[in-house]
Amino acid sequence: MIFDVAGLLAAGASASAHPHVWVTMQGELVYAADGSVTGVRYAWTFDDMFSAFATQGLEPKKPGVFTRQDLEPLAKENVNSLKDFGYFTFAKANGSKLEMKEPTDYYLDYNTKDTVLTLHFTLPFKAPVKAKELNVEIYDPEYFVDFSFKDVKDPISLVGAPAACKLVVARPKELTVPPGQQLGEAFFNQLSSSDNWGAQFANKISVKCP
């Protein structure tokens, strides 16, 4: 599975503290012609160490160059694994929780210069919804995975949204540890997803429409 704790540690991830995987992301909120929002279109770029771990054992036709076809089985495994984590996406429309359908249009590509994988996928909402207020948060409740918006002007955009809709994107705060204290693996091993500890590092998207 894509977020296999034991496998990542065996591959050399630090056992001293979370997180173990870093994801830099961009995305689009997709709207239908009637002004309802239908889902989120993502591009998640994994750190180079995780990318190396994930591609171990793959045999591309050209060494070091992975095509979408080479990565197709891995892409499928990735999106299947993400289901167990709720796709790390928590959305509400007009104050009510939105359920997700399974991802569509998913694929992986590989940047040979930076040696990183990027997972592209569309995450549809179970039903389109006309939302005066839409809030989406992306984070890992257990903070095994660190998510952050790409360092660009507009990491999130609206596609097909009514012109009067206003988008606000908020980046997560940095983790600060008081002097003399450490948040090692023992601390995180006590956590479960229900503790929702990682919510304090949520990447937040807010859209308000008249």
What is each stretch, according to the model?
Residues 11-14:
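N-terminal signal peptide c-region/cleavage motif recognized by signal peptidases
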Residues 16-18, 30-39, 108-114, 195-198:
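Short, solvent-exposed beta-strand/turn "edge" segments of beta-rich domains on protein surfaces
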